[in-house]
UniProtKB/Swiss-Prot annotation:
Residues 603-688 form the Smr domain. It is found in: Plastid, Chloroplast. Expressed in leaves and flowers and at lower levels in stems and flower buds. It comes from Arabidopsis thaliana (Mouse-ear cress). Disruption phenotype: Reduced plant size and pale-green leaf phenotype. One of its GO terms (molecular function) is mRNA binding. This is Pentatricopeptide repeat-containing protein At4g16390, chloroplastic. SMART domains: SMR.
């Protein structure tokens, strides 16, 4: 081991009773190996060299007890013992044993510890420091100086002690004393003093060594300035210093935190190949790197690799993994990691619970999110505005009205945060989805009293609420408020108006047409053509509808077509509904509605509104009838209709429940599959027989 690493373990200095200056004066210094003429981690030289001799230990790692006896400078071999320097066994029962023990170096080490404590406690001026050192009561050797500085903690007096010792003893290896002084600065996280001391070394012509750089690098990491750590690391080669693999492993973390992801991952690849020892902090940084880049599988791979290497995850790692799985919308994996955390004896902290709330809330895992919320309340943990809002948004998505009210009341009563615009928006949306008009109006009033003007999102929810309650006049009044506030309706707002029209009695639809025309003239034109039964030339409606589709965003195209088809079905205009469905197929807005295999033909409806699903069923049955009865095409053994098993966001029923009733009305031979939720199946024989009966009866509409 290089002598400059003796500073990492003061007790190791005590195995040789000789004054260190005697050893240093006899043996010449070895020439340090150069690192690289320029730092290039991709060069074959950089990747293939053994960076250290086997005995090298970094100042950044603890030294095992078994190694302490080996802490001898590779440049300074131990001299052969002479008769004058040989050890003498002392009988512990001897009356002189106590006196001899006091003279032993163990006793001297204790006195050096007390000297370090006295120097820490004295005033930071040269006179007081000199008095303490002079009052030590004996000559200080170079080894004593190293032990003393290594045990100091006061960054104000340490440089004064260093200067005093340099002047009084003229050490042969000054760099060692500088290194242990830097360790004092590292203990107090004083990077500025470390860098200033480095400059002083250069001014005095003292060449820094590996320990100098590793100490400054670790200080920079502790101070949370990874870019400075990178700067110091990249200076090493210019001073002929070569980092050990412990320092290299630490730089994975530093490069990652500094934003140089490519370098961090490059070093990590080397670490795996050369089997460096990587600590949990570095693994945590790697997980963060992959999480920020959106490589969530990479996060899990790092987690599995560290477990395979026997590195135990810490709480920070568990929290980052849970947060990453939340961002990936993988709440089931967040739940598994949380169970690992508990199984391995960790106690979840605020960050753990916050990550779980976000993970479950974003994915609409309502019961799990509420369970974590209640556990936080039981433990007296406060929530932030963002966490409250995440829970309220989840309640809106899951229509948890009572739970939303409970969370909102808790938020108002807590002293740590106040409701903001997002809070009221989510609360109003909860009530709007359930058609609770009075509660939505009360929440809107509270929002205004709190100093927040309603946003377009809020007013969209209010209109949706009035629409569900069939309060058409209030819909019109709210629309006028939007214009009065100078808010420009967007595609989603217009889609909401269109959705309200599908829930409005036909005799009142006329009140809403004017609103739609003002909000989006092209949409108003298409709606008027549907509602007012305008006679137009063939192809005109398709042209107008196509122009509408071209004018709206891709995120709302399907919603618009669903609503237009629903409106057609409500008005009993099946031909127009089929025309709009066909447009959706041509524009690839509706995809994957049908699938065919050798054993089954299927109709997939779960992404459609009720009217669009019924229209698609009508078209499919006509296609089946044409294929079987006119073209003579053979059916596969099974035919199926897949409605899905979820509920619509603003509906109490899912497609499955509605279709079960509708298929019975048609006397269709499709029956719900007991082992496949949301699937209705029939055999080819039964289907053909039913299609024959429909044709005989005059082709009753689906």
């Amino acid at each position: 081991m290089s002598f400059h690493h003796l500073c990492s373990s003061p007790s190791s200095l005590l195995h040789d009773p000789l004054p260190l200056c005697n050893l240093l004066s006899v043996y010449p210094k070895s020439t340090p190996r150069s690192f690289l003429s320029s730092y290039n981690p991709n060069s074959s030289h950089f990747h293939s060299r053994n960076l250290l001799q086997a005995t090298h230990v970094s100042v950044q790692e603890a030294i095992p007890q078994s190694e302490k006896s080996k802490l001898v400078d590779v440049d300074l071999p131990i001299p052969e013992p002479t008769a004058s320097k040989s050890y003498v066994w002392v009988n512990p029962k001897s009356p002189r044993a106590s006196q001899l023990r006091r003279k032993s170096y163990d006793s001297r080490y204790s006195s050096l510890i007390k000297l370090a404590e006295s120097l820490d406690a004295c005033k930071p001026n040269e006179a007081d420091v000199c008095d303490v050192i002079t009052g030590f009561g004996g000559k200080l050797f170079e080894q004593d100086a190293v032990v003393t500085l290594n045990n100091m903690t006061n960054p104000e007096t340490a440089p004064l002690v260093l200067n005093n010792l340099l002047e009084t003893m003229k050490p042969s290896r000054e760099v060692i004393l500088y290194n242990v002084t830097m360790k004092v600065f590292r203990k107090s996280k004083d990077l500025e003093k470390s860098e200033k001391l480095f400059d002083e070394m250069l001014e005095r012509g003292i060449k820094p060594d590996n320990a100098t750089f590793t100490t400054i690098i670790s200080c920079a990491r502790q101070n949370g300035v990874p870019k400075r750590a990178v700067e110091w690391f990249e200076k090493m080669s210019s001073f002929g210093c070569e980092p050990d693999n412990v320092t290299m492993a630490a730089m994975i973390d530093a490069y990652g935190r500094a934003g140089n992801v490519d370098m961090a991952l490059s070093l990590y690849d080397r670490a795996r190949t050369e089997k460096w020892r990587i600590d949990a902090v570095t693994f945590s940084t790697l997980i963060r790197i992959y999480g920020v880049s959106g490589n969530y599988d990479g996060c899990l791979n790092i987690y599995e690799e560290m477990k395979a290497l026997g590195v135990k995850p810490n709480l920070v790692i568990y929290n980052r993994l849970i947060d990453s799985m939340g961002r990936a919308k993988r709440p089931w994996q967040a739940k598994i990691i949380y169970k690992d955390l508990i199984t391995n004896g960790f106690t979840p902290n605020w960050s753990t619970y916050a990550a779980l709330v976000r993970a479950y809330g974003r994915a609409r895992y309502g019961d799990d999110a509420l369970a974590i919320y209640r556990e936080m309340k039981e433990k007296g943990l406060s929530l932030t505005v963002i966490l409250y809002n995440t829970l309220l948004s989840m309640c809106a998505d899951n229509r948890y009205v009572d739970e939303a009210f409970e969370i909102f009341q808790d938020m108002k009563n807590c002293e740590t945060c106040d409701p903001d615009s997002w809070t009221f928006s989510s609360l109003i949306t909860v009530y709007a989805c359930s058609g609770r008009v009075s509660e939505a109006e009360a929440a809107l009033l509270q929002m205004r009293e709190a100093g927040f003007e309603p946003t377009l999102f809020v007013l969209t929810s209010v209109i949706q609420c009035y629409g569900k309650a069939k309060q058409v006049d209030d819909v019109v009044r709210t629309f006028d408020q939007v214009l009065e506030l100078g808010i420009t309706p967007d595609d989603r707002f217009c889609g909401c108006l269109l959705n309200v029209m599908t829930q409005t009695p036909s005799e009142e639809i006329g009140k809403l047409i004017g609103c739609v025309e003002k909000a989006k003239p092209k949409l108003g034109q298409v709606v008027k053509m549907l509602v007012e039964e305008q006679n137009c030339e063939e192809g005109v409606f398709k042209k107008e509808a196509s122009e509408l589709i071209d004018s709206i965003g891709s995120d709302v195209k399907k919603a618009y077509l669903n609503c237009l088809i629903d409106l057609c079905v409500n008005l009993n205009k099946l031909e127009r509904a089929c025309e709009i469905l066909q447009l959706g197929l041509e524009y690839d807005i509706y995809t994957g509605l049908q699938s065919k295999s050798a054993t089954q033909w299927s109709l997939h409806l779960k992404s459609l509104s009720l009217g669009a699903a019924l229209t698609a069923l009508h078209v499919w049955m006509n296609d089946l009838s044409e294929a079987a009865l006119e073209s003579g095409e053979e059916f596969p053994p099974l035919l199926g209709i897949n409605t899905g098993h979820g509920k619509h966001k603003y509906s109490d029923k899912g497609l499955a429940a509605v279709f079960e009733s509708h298929l019975k009305e048609l006397n269709a031979p499709f029956h719900e599959a007991p082992d496949k939720v949301g699937w209705f199946l029939t055999t080819s024989v039964a289907a053909k027989a039913w299609l024959e009966s429909r044709r005989s009866a005059g082709g009753v509409s689906a």
